[in-house]
Amino acid sequence: MPDAMSAGAILRALLPEMLLSGGAMLLLLASVWTPQGNQPGAAEGAERTSVLARFGVILCLVVGLAVVIAWGDGAAGTPDGRVAGDGFRWAVDLVILLGTALALMLLEAEHQRSAAFGPEVPSLMLLASTGMMVLAGARDLMFVFLGVELMSLAVYVLAGVNRRSARSAEAAVKYFLLGAISSGFLLYGMALLFGATGSTRLQDITEWAAAQATLSPLFMSGVALLLVGLAFKVAAAPFHLWTPDVYDGAPLPVTAFMSATVKTAAFAVFARIMIEGLAVAAPRWHMGLWWLAAVTMVVGNVFALSQRNLVRMLAYSSIAHAGYLLVSIIVGDAAGTSALIFYVVSYTLATMGAFGVLITINGGRDRAPTLDDIAGLWLVRPWLAIAMTVFLLAFMGMPVLGGMGFFAKWYILQAALQAPAPQTILAVVLVIASAVSAAYYLAVVSAMFMRPRPEGQPVPSTTPLNQSLIATAAVALLVFGLYPTPIMELARRATTTTSPTSNPAAPRGEVRLQTASVPR
């Protein structure tokens, strides 16, 4: 009976991941199934991709409902504590599913223009999302590695999924080679931590570190290598060099998926490992992470200034946003992690909306859109120019017109300044970096509204699906920018501990992520 009870608890804890992976496998089977073994024609294959993308969106909604029910019912993690059942996991899962659903909608919109994607692509996105959800709940380094590899292997393929494009193939090779190196750092760091502590569970690692008078060089070497591997996954400088080339070469829907959803999952596991698992070692890793955040904010924004290629500009912008999110991890308390959740919601909406506009103006061409392509957009598609302005101002953090983007940065600044150990200098760097970002974001706005439309430039045409995605993302950013309380309240509930500190070994100011009860 105890074994049956344990099996039931494990099934309940992993039900969302099982639903998503099972649905992904069914869609994969549907992508290759043909009646009586007949090979589908090109038109049938193209239509099948669109249909499977729609089923993928429905699957994300179903799994999202399962996550909401699990959160509301107080579903716990696995009995051995290797998978969390806390609000942080469920909140991040919902953001991941939101990003995946929007990316699938972008995929269909792009596919209707270029017919560049095979019917297996929606399944690959869903499998990658399964790995991301594993990362969101992982409390064991082996589960972390399992989630990273499941996510990464699918995304490597997605980057090169347009087999008619040499740029896409180049992006896939670069991402695979550099991703394999980063996974080596990650795995070697985990091995050293296991060698030092005798366990891969975050709770055991924390308890071991708390019992030591001094932390061994073996342990700290493992922490350093783990930090390098995670920094690559979130595209933090100087481990960001792959980002512009891969984003530029990958298909636009895949780039949006990588920029928003992959980053959300990577930061979720980054936060859980550093705040929950390695909090005792914070005095040793804090300064390294501090410099990583500062350099990332500066490098991302400075290199974005000279870009005319809009995808490369957004790639460097995403590097800068990684720096902002690192500040929330450095803060290391409930305010910081709740600000992180709010930020990734805002960033996901703005990124998906912005790439929806880029897909529209690019018209299915095998190249990244430039400033010339978006010039004079106000003259031919005013609503697209207005929506793109909302997304860019959200990235910048402009009050009111930037919607949620302003409060996303405000909450991180507030957490940094009100932390037990205030991060005043980092807050100043964040403000200055955001001011620098205004130059390249407003350059795009200026091109849309102030420059004439180049002769011979086609008028962008949109599909109803892409129109609805862009409009929904823009309206959501504006509405929750005027009334951010519901999202922020959910983020606070997701990251508030049930006691003043559920990790007695953590240093002052460190709050362990919620472990059992669900917010009421």
Curated annotation (Swiss-Prot):
The EC number of this protein is: 7.1.1.-
Give the GO biological process terms: ATP synthesis coupled electron transport
Is Membrane there in the keyword field?
A: yes
Segments passing through the bilayer: 13-33, 55-75, 87-107, 115-135, 141-161, 176-196, 219-239, 250-270, 285-305, 313-333, 339-359, 383-403, 425-445, 468-488
GO (cellular component) term, any one? plasma membrane
Keywords of this entry: Cell inner membrane, Cell membrane, Membrane, NAD, Quinone, Translocase, Transmembrane, Transmembrane helix, Transport, Ubiquinone
Write out the biased-composition intervals (Low complexity). 494-508
UniProt-recorded Gene Ontology molecular function terms? NADH dehydrogenase (ubiquinone) activity; NADH:ubiquinone reductase (non-electrogenic) activity; quinone binding
The lineage's top-level taxon is: Bacteria
Q: Which residues form the signal peptide?
A: none
Its subcellular locations are:
Cell inner membrane
Q: Where is this region: Disordered?
A: 494-520
Reaction(s) catalysed (UniProt annotation): a quinone + NADH + 5 H(+)(in) = a quinol + NAD(+) + 4 H(+)(out)
Subunit structure of this chain's protein = NDH-1 is composed of 14 different subunits. Subunits NuoA, H, J, K, L, M, N constitute the membrane sector of the complex.
Sequence similarity? Belongs to the complex I subunit 2 family.
Query: So what does this one do?
Result: NDH-1 shuttles electrons from NADH, via FMN and iron-sulfur (Fe-S) centers, to quinones in the respiratory chain. The immediate electron acceptor for the enzyme in this species is believed to be ubiquinone. Couples the redox reaction to proton translocation (for every two electrons transferred, four hydrogen ions are translocated across the cytoplasmic membrane), and thus conserves the redox energy in a proton gradient.
Q: What is this protein called?
A: NADH-quinone oxidoreductase subunit N
Q: What taxonomic ancestry is recorded?
A: Bacteria, Pseudomonadati, Gemmatimonadota, Gemmatimonadia, Gemmatimonadales
